[in-house]
């Protein structure tokens, strides 16, 4: 429980700082809101394989630099793909010419954005998985103080969306230097064994993330056809929804520290269930309190009243995310990443079909909110069923 509280405090600090960062983007204009939302959807897809190294490390827990290199290599590859396909990607969304031009400019330096972002994220996670929570908190402070200071400068003197994204990249670089200096990881290049582990564990995990995020992109693309105002409402509400995930992510991060203490599947399962029962009331309460805090901070140029009552339906996603994170952790600790792929496939297809069905109805925004719960709860059911069957067949050490 103490790990959860410590990580939760760090994650709440992160979410508030991220909301302030988003607010700078959103204050520029409604075009900036739409472009930022579209850019983040693109990033969610392409960073799936740019995080393949750290996905593998979650299971192996050794040879840190070898897996960080895979983040860097795949980040460069993803950046090249985005730059090559830039015109095609920009035209996926139903954007105005001004919005397309703004998005095109951001995609020009996506390779740098994704490499530094995934490297920083990988090192942050390594520190957390090692249980070095004091260094983790200090590193977060370094990153966010740099980010907000640079954001403030860029907004006050330029109000340029591109420079706000450059501020993020520079802040990542500063935090990477700070963390590597203090962590003192043994420098290693990838070898045949780490490559095998990436193929065995990381590839299925990255594929699951990619598939899930492709359907989330389609989710955003479908939403863009509701018109600029409704898409703007969706973008703000969904960005709040994504920020709220930081609470359940803190819960899952604590599980990733505690669950491996169990030597058998049954012990790990019991660790998960005990943690779940202890944390549930606190997570639900925080979810709804911070829903309104994040909304007030990040609504930007969109009138606050236009987000009601839709934001309530978007925030219900926590009831699906909570069991999802619980059983996902068990899949990772047991090295069964293929289960994640199966569950996500089912969940995202359900999300996509429901949104498509209700797109042109008067209550489309309500549906686009509630499908977050339906998607993740469906995944958790699949994870639980498959894990149970594998356990009964003796596929785990019980």
Regions found by a protein language model. Give the residues of each.
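Hydrophobic faces of transmembrane alpha-helices in multi-pass small-molecule transporters and flippases
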Residues: 1-16, 107-111, 134-141, 178, ...
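Hydrophobic alpha-helical transmembrane segments
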Residues: 138-153, 157-185, 365-389
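Small-residue-rich hydrophobic transmembrane alpha-helices
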Residues: 26, 33-78, 121-128, 231-287, ...
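Signature of the first transmembrane helix
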Residues: 1-51, 203-226, 239, 376
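Interhelical loop/hinge segments that connect adjacent transmembrane helices in multipass membrane
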Residues: 1-4, 99-102, 161-214, 390-398
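Short membrane-interface helical motifs at transmembrane helix boundaries
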Residues: 77-104, 282-309
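Alpha-helical transmembrane segments of multi-pass membrane transporters/permeases
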Residues: 7-8, 62-69, 126-153, 165, ...
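Alpha-helical transmembrane segments of multi-pass membrane proteins
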Residues: 38, 97-123, 244, 301-327
